[in-house]
Amino acid sequence: MNTKSKHLVFLTGAGMSVESGFKTFRGADGLWENYPVAQVATHEGWEANPTLVTEFYNMLRQKLFDAQPNEGHRLIAQLEERFRVTVITQNVDNLHECAGSSEVVHLHGELSKVCSSRDPYNPHFIRQLTATDAVITPGTKAEDGSLLRPFIVFFGEAVPMMDAAMALTAQADLFGVIGTSLNVYPAAGLINFVPRGVPIIIIDPEPISTTVNGGITQIQKGASEGMKELVETLLPRLFHNN
């Protein structure tokens, strides 16, 4: 059997990156790095104070460039030696790419990029940043004359990569969920697009609650330990010819 004939699709969330020391999620108190989410992660917040928003993401971006992929990221990337692997991530970091994953769909944008505030998804106005130019001076303009804004899907904005994510999920031979509680929509709805009979593996140290019936196996561990169990124990059992 051609080992690349099987398609593994992973949906990853904040718990995937926490072992790398990078936190890109809001707490139960509605704060993100001590800032109210409404101020730094909404279109209204951007319109009201683009300087604050630019400086907030400068801070996060500098933390990102100090972070390193963890064993969980690396194990997912290594599976590409034997399978087609797609990562659909709710995270705005680029740690999957740093670990070597080649097919990554970012649902909520990418912290390492900035874009036009007038035409955010025009590729001509999207700029990739590096550790040496991670800080954007507030007021810097894109090539179309609008302010550069973080290439982030703010709360309340449409998720443009969702259709692609649904189509990829519908092709899965295995669907893995790592580090997300499945209560962030629309991403949480992806589990409903998994073909009938396809195994669903959820890696999360907390007990899961999902309305999908049957076919779900939980590995109640963190991302790295859970991925190790998936690779060493579950995958050989599920795809023994691979």
Predicted segments — roles?
Residues 1-242:
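Conserved catalytic core of sirtuin-type NAD+-dependent deacylases
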